[in-house]
């Protein structure tokens, strides 16, 4: 991961922008191209098949994080983020993740603080009930889902107004229900 990030940055800095000739700085995030670009990218060495959705941000491929939230965050923070203009991790947690933890707010504070101290740049955090998201997909007319807002990346959207494909991709990211 670090070697790929460094290589990408070295290639980009060889180019200059059209506004003052400053060296280019790559980004490690995508507003929507992780979904829209899937048909233009073949299979990848991590086991992703051609046509599958790409990983969102600097996260692993949806469903590929097998060791848990903290190892994923440590891996994401291992690249030198000062070389990039952006790179967020998507932390999509189900409420049961906090079962057995005395203070969920202290856990989030401590997790976030450790991530930033280790070099991480940005966290997009959700605590959403997977069952509610799935029900909202099937029953968008229900009053309780009219104001269900989710953070996509650099913007938010009402969940029921998203296309079915985007809803499914978003739900596929809800992979942290426990520490491991």
Positions of predicted regions on the chain:
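Acidic, glycine-enriched catalytic cores built around paired aspartates
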Residues: 1-180
């Amino acid at each position: 991961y670090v070697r790929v990030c460094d290589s990408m940055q070295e290639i980009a800095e060889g180019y200059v922008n059209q506004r003052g000739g400053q060296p280019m700085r790559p980004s490690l995030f995508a507003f929507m191209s992780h979904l829209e670009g899937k048909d233009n990218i073949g299979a990848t060495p991590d086991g992703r098949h051609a046509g599958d959705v790409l990983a969102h941000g600097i996260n692993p491929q949806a469903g590929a994080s097998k060791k848990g939230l903290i190892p994923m965050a440590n891996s994401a923070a291992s690249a030198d983020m000062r070389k990039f203009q952006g790179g967020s991790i998507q932390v999509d947690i189900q409420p049961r993740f906090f079962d057995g933890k005395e203070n969920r707010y202290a856990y989030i504070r401590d997790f976030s603080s450790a991530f930033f101290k280790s070099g991480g740049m940005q966290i997009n955090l959700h605590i959403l009930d997977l069952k509610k998201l799935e029900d909202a997909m099937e029953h968008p007319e229900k009053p309780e889902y009219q104001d269900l807002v989710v953070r996509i990346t650099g913007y938010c959207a009402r969940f029921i107004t998203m296309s079915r494909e985007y809803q499914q991709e978003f739900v596929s990211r809800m992979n942290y229900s426990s520490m491991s």
